[in-house]
């Protein structure tokens, strides 16, 4: 679930950390659900006060989820819960230590199928370009990132699944 609240000027705002003060409203992270809440004025009904929904709310949600995911990915990397590059991810997947993966959105179909071939049930988030993933790993471009089964990676996996659901309409994997 993702949380929304409203500012003192009565604008609906996306609460990417889920910790902003005030009355909040939790919504399923699918784009269609958020759009439905906007269209049917569910925010005003839930907050028990008239609120304004910004025209770019969907963009704010996507940007906020991306920002939060990349931030948590950086923390997981510093905590040693991340491997990258196809061979390293494949090894982690095969020995059971990887429980989640990121795949570049702009990867070729062949590159996307390589990892799926080994573990079809592995959850994958394909919401970032190879350059965005590369920047997080200190490289120019990265196609595959594996998230290891560690306690520190749990918030990252939860946020990445929300982002994937919001961007793709369904969880992949």
Kindly label every feature range from the protein language model.
Residues 113-116, 158:
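Short amphipathic alpha-helical segments
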Residues 120-162:
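Short basic, glycine-rich beta-strand/loop surfaces that mediate nucleic-acid
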């Amino acid at each position: 679930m993702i949380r929304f609240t409203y500012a003192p000027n009565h604008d609906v705002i996306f609460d990417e950390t889920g910790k902003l003060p005030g009355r909040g409203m939790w919504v399923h992270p699918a784009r269609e659900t958020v759009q439905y809440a906007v269209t049917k004025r569910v925010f005003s009904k839930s907050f028990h006060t008239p609120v304004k929904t910004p025209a770019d709310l969907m963009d704010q949600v996507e940007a906020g989820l991306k920002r939060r995911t990349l931030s948590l990915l950086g923390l997981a990397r510093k905590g040693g819960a991340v491997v990258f590059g196809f061979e390293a991810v494949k090894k982690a997947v095969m020995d059971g230590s990887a429980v989640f993966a990121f795949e570049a959105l702009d990867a070729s179909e062949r590159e996307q199928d390589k990892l799926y071939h080994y573990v079809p049930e592995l959850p994958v988030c394909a919401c970032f370009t190879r350059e965005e993933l590369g920047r997080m790993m200190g490289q120019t471009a990265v196609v595959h990132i594996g998230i290891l089964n560690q306690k520190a990676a749990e918030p990252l996996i939860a946020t990445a699944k929300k982002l994937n659901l919001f961007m793709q309409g369904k969880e992949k994997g």
